[in-house]
Amino acid sequence: MSFASFSDFLAMAHHGLYVWTAYAICLAVLVLNVAAPILARKRYLQQEARRLRRETEK
């Protein structure tokens, strides 16, 4: 599929809104799938560090 201009590429024969929204949602899901475990691990390590400090203070 070829387009006459970049504007035509973005419009995608009047399906651009659907196509680019689908790409954006897909990208958001991929980013969340990468970020969620990283943030969960960070939160877990912080909680464990707090727990360890509490136990050693007693």
Curated annotation (Swiss-Prot):
Membrane spanning residue stretches: 19-39
GO cellular component, one term: plasma membrane
InterPro entries xref list: Haem_export_protD_CcmD (IPR007078), Heme_exporter_D (IPR052075)
Annotated membrane topology: Single-pass membrane protein
Subcellular location field: Cell inner membrane
Principal localisation: membrane
Gene Ontology biological process terms in this record: cytochrome c biosynthetic process; cytochrome complex assembly; heme transport
Keyword vocabulary terms for this entry: Cell inner membrane, Cell membrane, Cytochrome c-type biogenesis, Membrane, Transmembrane, Transmembrane helix, Transport
Similarity section: Belongs to the CcmD/CycX/HelD family.
Functional summary from the UniProt entry: Required for the export of heme to the periplasm for the biogenesis of c-type cytochromes.
Name by which UniProt lists this protein: Heme exporter protein D
